Amino acid sequence: MLVQNICSTKAYNMLILNNNAFLVDVRTQEEWKQVGIPHLDNKNKVIFLSLQLNKNFEDNFLSIINEKIDTAIFFLCRSGYRSFIAANFIANIGYKNCYNISDGFEGNNQDKGWKQNNLPWQF
């Protein structure tokens, strides 16, 4: 299955409704510290796994998310580009329900993003 692009508000609603879904934030540690991170009531649903210069991304991902290949996994970065790469990478190893949050955490040229859409976040 191809990666599905969805906006942050739709992703948030799907994450809240699906207890088995995960959010994978692929931004850098500096971004997490300086800009903030998404907040979900179920802390186990948010995984912080930087994509940048991480040749072990696949192994790290599999060691953290040892779930069925049909688990819904949402990928987030600043504006939707790196998360799209990560989502495609994971889809190509067999995961069937990969979603790219296309407006990212901070937004892009077209959409506001997680933070500006007033979805839960924290420092």
UniProtKB/Swiss-Prot annotation:
Name the Pfam families for this protein.
Rhodanese
- Going by the entry's taxonomy, the superkingdom of the source organism is recorded as Bacteria
Coiled-coil ranges from the UniProt annotation? none
Against InterPro entries, the record matches this protein to:
Rhodanese-like_dom, Rhodanese-like_dom_sf, STR4-like
| SMART domains linked to this entry | RHOD
Domain Rhodanese positions: 17-117
* PANTHER family xref list: RHODANESE-LIKE DOMAIN-CONTAINING PROTEIN 4, CHLOROPLASTIC
Q: What's the protein called, per UniProt? A: Uncharacterized protein RP600
Natural source organism:
Rickettsia prowazekii (strain Madrid E)
